[in-house]
Amino acid sequence: MNAIDLFSGAGGLSLALQESGFTILMANEINERFAQTHKLNFPTVPLIMKDINSVTAEEIRALIGDVIVDLIVGGPPCQGFSVFGKRRFINTQDYDPHQDPRNFLVYQYIRIVKELRPKFFFMENVKGFTNLDKGLFVEEVKNQFRALGYNNIWCEIVCAADYGVPQERYRMFMIGNRLGIDYEPPSQTHFPMGTGKLPEYTTVGPAIMDLVGKENQIPNHVPLIHKPIVEARYGYVKEGCKLNVNDLPPELAVATRRDSKTGKVSNYSHVFKRLDRNRPSTTMVPGHNAFPIHPTLNRTLTAREAARIQTFPDSHIFCGTRQEQCIQVGNAVPPRMAEPFLRKIKQYLEHEEEMK
């Protein structure tokens, strides 16, 4: 079975495809650094590095030949669908998803599906995708796929922790096919603590604590050097908690950020939050300044630690500066999250082949 990976990024879905037994025919990525990472980790996969708006079916066919495409996967960049993305608009009540140019890439994904006619498509995005315009936007997207013959569409919000990822990350998965198959999602494999169901959620400790003391010894495991005042503040954040500004002594409570209106340090929830070794992580937000604090050390996570939480193997190398690495890691789909859904697609495709 073969697949195409659009908006491939650093290769989270490509890795999941590979682990699920698919042959990756080609990938597409516009960002040079992301593409460099993808080429390094998938050297045999042809990659078109350009804006998908200018990628044609003829160009793709020149790479892959006349083979039948079984599956197209991809996560169109989602800034316009996310809570953080919508905050860029002064009045979010007036926000129109159809007018946000960051959302147009979804239509390019649909165009490629239309032109290549895969048997299945797999599209992922932030959970906010389903709420835009009171749910009308996602229905419009579904209707566009249905107009192409993809009448069987499954669309749900999925929690990564439910499938063994040490992270409570929520994503929208939309899976459709033109074979008349009612897609049944894979059964949940892990369960929240305290429910009595086993196995329980995978936690941060087993994922990253063996990396302590190995800084700068393995790829992408380079700590950010914090200012002394920031490192000192981290010392007041208890494991599994956010910073309580009232706990800081006066000399540490003085703001160092130019945008502070109060003169005191603010509790930026995505910055001053320490992970708990005995619980899954919160969502890995892209960017080296957005990663949470290490469970036991007074620093934020390294790109490698974040990649572990995203379920990338240590053999998967991220190119570029530390900041570029962290953006790649934070943007990626956790391979272990997508893999069971892709395996299920592969099973349907194999059964369809047997029925011929």
Model-derived features: where do they sit?
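C-terminal target-recognition/interaction regions appended to catalytic cores
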Residues: 224-356
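Class I S-adenosyl-L-methionine
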Residues: 59-67, 83-265
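Extreme N-terminal starter segment of soluble prokaryotic enzymes
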Residues: 1-3
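Short beta-strand element of Class I
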Residues: 24-25
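Conserved proline-anchored active-site loop of SAM-dependent methyltransferases
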Residues: 5-12, 66-88, 120-125, 174-178, ...
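S-adenosyl-L-methionine
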Residues: 36-64
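Conserved SAM-binding loop of SAM-dependent methyltransferases across substrates and taxa
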Residues: 10-20
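Conserved SAM/SAH-binding beta-strand->alpha-helix loop
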Residues: 31
